[in-house]
Amino acid sequence: AYKHYNALDMYQACDDLGRAVEFLKGCEFVEGRLGVLGYCLGGTLAYSLAANEHLSAGVSYYGSGIGEMLNKTPRMAFPFLFHFAGDDHLVAMKEVTRLKPLLSATGDATFRIYEGQRHGFNCVERDSYSMRAALLAKADTLRFLAQHLVR
């Protein structure tokens, strides 16, 4: 996974995602509001779309590169839910503490911290998986998406 991560052109990936949102918004079969959700790198990529006016909600699970994206997203165009693990080797709590006021200043940001959990707590295939934390995060995510996407 790290080999692919290191080879990824973040600028191109973000541009591709923006174009995908534009495409979906123009499709006749897409009804209602669109949201974005991602895990780890996907959580960072989801946040890269935070200024996209075509989206209505975003969710990031332990996005490990959000700090580097802050200067590219002066404001969030829609509410965003951020899930972070309390004992994450890729996103230290010091970084989460730094990010909270910065992200909150750019828009409607909600934070959930899962104390004692490690990166990947939501992935059943990892030894860091926590059913309890995963179920709590899923419930929060579903409530959040229903609140912002369902009319």
Question: Can you name each region flagged by the protein language model?
Answer:
Residues 1-151:
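N-terminal cap/leader regions of alpha/beta-hydrolase-fold enzymes
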